[in-house]
């Protein structure tokens, strides 16, 4: 099967997801697991709280991605 280039939308989605994971990692590292909330994560990256759920189902899914 031939590899295909990612569309601009797919690249943007991957970049946003990576940004969320990096921000979550920073929050956990600096403030601890209990300090990580969906709201705090959204504020850190400058997006609406509900938009985070487009990338992760819940806090556990974020932590799994961070690990």
What are these regions (language model features)?
Residues 1-31, 35-40, 44, 61-64:
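Basic, helix-initiating cap at the start of DNA-binding domains
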Residues 45-56:
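Short hydrophobic/aromatic patch on the recognition helix
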Residues 52, 60-67:
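Short, intrinsically disordered, charge-balanced linker/junction segments flanking boundaries
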